[in-house]
């Protein structure tokens, strides 16, 4: 099954690479003193023999210094086939983007415990004060940094399948964390892709706070990024309608569709070399960068 999966993802990755490489070689410089002879301008030499020959040269376009962050839901509901597919997609697509000169960071998020960790113990010791906020300890994982080559991350990605790693998912703080890492990058274009299979859930937190506490915080973080940040945000939901939260999103019904969805969305983003996508980024870059969500869990 793993080999078949790699083959399917590999074909999609090759399609992505062909599209990206075609974009890189789309521009030409004309009227140069050296390069490839420009046959279209030979008539000038015929009509005026004293006119020098004209040459042209292909010009690379490197996607304006781009970095992509893949943020993967490492919750318990992803156990088994979904997390294996997600890890395989991240691996192969990151290698593909890397070959095209695009840097990729791969991150994951879960919690350290099922029913609250030290955060809950501290709350109990304090006498259970009201509205405590988050009552579980976060686990944010860096599987691959943007500056490290993909060949060094192979063993790290295998950790996603480790027994006992996948627990609860507190999406809002994970999204803010990944976003802040991107804000510190020097690249001109920064893309954040969230892959999740459900709404934020942590039983320890939700049992003692107001309803939709984690979901409300997630919506606040998304709004900050989508309206005030230069980072381009996109989400893919596995069996979960993420279009309820994100402006730019797609929902798939089965993990086997993940590679196709990721590839399609990346092609769509990189096709935005002009037009509305570019103008949207410029508008966001003129806005104030977010300092974080208006209401933080603690």
Question: Predicted regions span which residues?
Answer:
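Acidic, glycine-rich A-domain
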Residues: 1-298
């Amino acid at each position: 099954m793993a080999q078949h999966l790699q083959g399917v993802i590999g074909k999609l990755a090759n399609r992505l690479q062909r599209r990206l490489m075609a974009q890189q070689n789309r521009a030409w410089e004309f009227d140069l003193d050296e390069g490839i002879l420009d046959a279209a301008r030979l008539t000038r030499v015929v009509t005026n023999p004293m006119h020098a020959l004209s040459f042209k040269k292909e010009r690379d376009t490197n996607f304006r210094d781009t970095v992509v962050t893949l943020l993967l839901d490492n919750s318990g509901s992803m156990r088994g086939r979904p997390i294996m597919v997600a890890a395989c997609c991240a691996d192969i697509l990151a290698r593909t983007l890397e070959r095209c000169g695009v840097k990729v960071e791969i991150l994951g998020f879960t919690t350290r415990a099922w029913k609250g960790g030290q955060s809950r113990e501290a709350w109990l010791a304090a006498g259970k004060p009201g509205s405590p906020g988050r009552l579980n300890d976060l686990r944010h994982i860096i599987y691959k940094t943007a500056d490290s080559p993909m060949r060094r991350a192979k063993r790290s990605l295998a950790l996603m399948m480790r027994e006992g790693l996948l627990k609860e998912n507190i999406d809002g703080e994970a999204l803010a964390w990944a976003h802040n890492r991107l804000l510190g990058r020097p690249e001109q274009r920064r893309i954040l892709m969230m892959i999740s299979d459900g709404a934020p859930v942590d039983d320890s937190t939700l049992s003692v706070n107001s309803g939709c506490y984690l979901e409300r915080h997630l919506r606040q973080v998304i709004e900050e990024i989508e309206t005030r940040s230069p980072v381009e945000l996109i989400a893919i939901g596995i069996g979960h309608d993420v279009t309820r939260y994100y402006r730019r999103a797609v929902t798939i019904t089965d993990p086997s569709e993940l590679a196709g969805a990721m590839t399609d969305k990346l092609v769509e983003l990189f096709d935005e070399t002009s037009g509305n996508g570019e103008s949207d980024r410029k508008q966001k870059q003129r806005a104030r960068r977010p300092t974080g969500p208006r209401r933080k869990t603690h």
